Every structure is written in structure tokens, then in C-alpha cells.
């Protein structure tokens, strides 16, 4: 069995954090239930036996920490709600377990928290840093919008994508907070959203929400150099669509990107030791607004959550040779599901 969690919005019928079990033999979800009712748990991450979730209470915003029990049940450790500048959209724990990073889309903020490595508690908000760069010309680029904040594979920096300014910003981090180190500029109206790094850490795949493209980049000492780019939606599609999540298969051979609007998952083969991509196919996701997905440790299944429509959880069996996906199950429902954590 694979144990997983789905974070959700709680604006409509979403309950917070869902817990599920996937049968690894059949590819079917055998149990999906509310794991913990908490407001606005739009992104989740974990570090060993601790789970962290974005949350808020009224105007107070921040993150919550949980202990993961043997059966997958969640027990609240504490909350750190030290800001009134808006809820986050992405969180990750540093590789040494000392820090938690949070991206805040609406206010264009990067937050860094101090963690207790033994208890899993969030001790304090170290810094809340506002991006102040010139914006792009797209109608959604009215201000800075930080969408991703995660450690680089060399463990030297934390990197932020800024959808509002078409920039990827690299910071040094530590007890004193964040210190800007490098800025990588992308095309006007790209809207960089998320990043997936190659297994060797030498290349990064940066997905752009507004242009619906993925940039293949060379990563070196905090800087990103674009090598090529590809569209994630068909050239003859004229509807509205905006790219969402990106994940690399664990074997590093295939890249997957979800499209909201076109409601699909684009599949690419990774070539030339990570320097190039080749489009394989674009697979329907079987519901509306596939905001996030994840791939099981075995590489055999891809689990996709949908924010809109019926909020189905689509389970795809993955061909480990071709990278192609085939639908196995779509009966489970996770209302307003927007993050899949395994």
C-alpha cells in the first residue's frame, strides 16, 4: 500500500487534508477520508515523520506541523501564524530539516521559518521578504507573485519563481533569513511557476504558467541558463489554459506537466543527460483543473488531483519504458484537491 495525502482549498466543500491508501497491485484507491480538518491547506510537505501544511485562521496566516502516526493519522504539533500578508501556495523543508520555506503568491513574499528538528515544531518565522522587481505585461502580472520556494540540489541556495516578474531568484539562507544571490530573467509574460531538477542536479525544468511552456535550463551555482523550450498544450488548442505542476519520474527518464483548462498531462522524454526534451503525448486528466499530481516511489503510478469539476482523483498506470499513462481508477473524490503528497 502507498499512503498519501491531498491538500485542498476550503472555500467550497474542501475539508483540508485528505488521507488515502493506494493498492500498489491494482492501482485503485481503497480508502480516502478526511485526515485533518484545517483551513486553506493548499500545499503540503513532509520531513520524515512530520507533515507540514499551509493554513490560516481569519487574517492570521502561516503553517501548521503534524506528527504522522504509524497508521497515517495526523496529530497536530503546533501552528505558526505570524503574518497577516496572505496565505502561501507552496512549502518545502530544507534538506537539513532546520528550515521551512513558504511562497506567498498574492503578496509576492518569500518566508523562511525555523524548525525544531527533534519535535517537528515550527519555532518562529525568521523572515518575510517581499519581491520588488519590474513586472511583466500580462494582465495577471500586476505585481510580484512568488509561486515556488525550494532548496537547490547542491544544498547551497533556495530558489523562488516569480510569476509576476518573469524571474527566478536565488537566495542564500540561514539563521539570519534570506540574502539575494542571483536573478535569472525569462521572457516577458512567461510567468514562471514551478521547477523540477534533474536527478544529477545539473539541469532544471522551469514551467511557465502564462506561456504554457517549459524551459530546459542548465543549473550552475544558483544560476539558470535556458537551453530550449517546449509547449505543453497542442498548437491547435484555442481555449484558455494555464500550466500547473511539474514532476520528474524517479528514474529521471520522463517529465510530466499538468495543464488546467486543457485538462491534461503533457509527457516528455528526457534526452542528452537532461539537456533536452522530446514530446511523447498529451494525456487527458479526466476531470477539471488538474492542479497537482505525484508519482509513486515505484514509478508505477501517477496520482492526479483536480481542483474543479467533480474533484476526482485520477490514478494512471505508468509505462516505465515509454513513460505513457493509462487510466486505472477515477472513483475517489477529494473536494478542491490541489496538492498530492506521497
UniProtKB/Swiss-Prot annotation:
Gene3D superfamilies: YVTN repeat-like/Quinoprotein amine dehydrogenase
Pfam families given in the database record: Lactonase (PF10282)
GO cellular component: cytosol
Leader sequence residues: none
GO MF terms held by the record: 6-phosphogluconolactonase activity
Superkingdom assignment: Bacteria
Family per record: Belongs to the cycloisomerase 2 family.
Protein name: Uncharacterized protein SERP1457
Organism: Staphylococcus epidermidis (strain ATCC 35984 / DSM 28319 / BCRC 17069 / CCUG 31568 / BM 3577 / RP62A)
Amino acid at each position: 500500500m502507498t499512503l498519501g495525502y491531498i491538500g485542498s482549498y476550503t472555500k467550497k466543500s474542501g475539508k483540508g487534508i485528505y488521507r488515502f491508501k493506494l493498492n500498489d497491485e491494482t492501482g485503485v484507491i481503497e480508502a480516502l477520508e478526511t485526515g485533518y480538518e484545517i483551513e486553506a491547506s493548499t500545499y503540503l510537505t513532509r520531513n520524515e515523520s512530520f507533515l507540514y501544511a499551509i493554513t490560516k485562521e481569519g487574517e492570521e496566516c502561516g503553517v501548521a506541523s503534524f506528527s504522522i502516526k504509524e497508521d497515517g493519522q495526523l496529530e497536530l504539533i503546533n501552528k505558526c501564524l505570524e503574518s497577516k500578508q496572505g496565505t502561501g501556495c507552496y512549502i518545502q523543508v530544507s534538506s537539513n530539516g532546520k528550515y521551512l520555506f513558504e511562497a506567498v503568491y498574492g503578496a509576492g513574499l518569500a518566508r523562511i521559518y525555523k524548525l525544531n528538528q527533534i519535535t517537528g515544531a515550527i519555532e518562529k518565522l525568521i523572515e518575510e521578504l517581499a519581491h520588488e522587481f519590474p513586472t511583466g505585461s500580462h494582465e495577471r502580472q500586476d505585481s510580484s507573485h512568488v509561486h515556488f520556494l525550494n532548496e537547490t540540489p547542491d544544498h547551497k541556495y533556495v530558489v523562488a519563481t516569480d510569476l509576476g516578474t518573469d524571474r527566478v531568484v536565488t537566495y542564500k539562507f540561514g539563521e539570519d533569513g534570506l540574502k539575494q544571490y542571483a536573478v535569472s530573467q525569462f521572457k516577458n509574460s512567461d510567468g514562471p511557476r514551478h521547477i523540477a531538477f534533474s536527478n544529477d542536479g545539473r539541469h532544471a525544468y522551469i514551467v511557465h504558467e502564462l506561456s504554457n511552456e517549459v524551459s530546459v535550463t542548465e543549473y550552475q551555482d544558483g544560476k539558470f541558463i535556458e537551453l530550449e523550450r517546449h509547449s505543453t498544450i497542442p498548437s491547435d488548442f484555442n481555449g484558455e489554459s494555464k500550466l500547473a505542476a511539474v514532476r520528474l519520474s524517479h528514474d529521471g527518464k520522463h517529465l510530466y506537466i499538468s495543464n488546467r483548462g486543457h485538462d491534461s498531462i503533457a509527457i516528455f522524454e528526457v534526452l542528452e543527460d537532461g539537456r533536452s526534451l522530446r514530446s511523447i503525448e498529451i494525456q487527458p486528466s479526466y476531470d477539471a483543473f488538474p492542479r497537482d499530481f505525484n508519482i509513486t516511489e515505484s514509478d508505477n503510478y501517477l496520482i492526479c488531483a483536480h481542483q474543479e469539476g467533480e474533484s476526482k482523483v485520477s490514478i494512471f498506470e505508468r509505462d516505465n519504458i515509454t513513460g505513457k499513462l493509462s487510466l486505472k481508477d477515477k472513483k475517489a473524490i477529494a473536494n478542491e484537491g490541489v496538492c498530492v503528497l506521497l
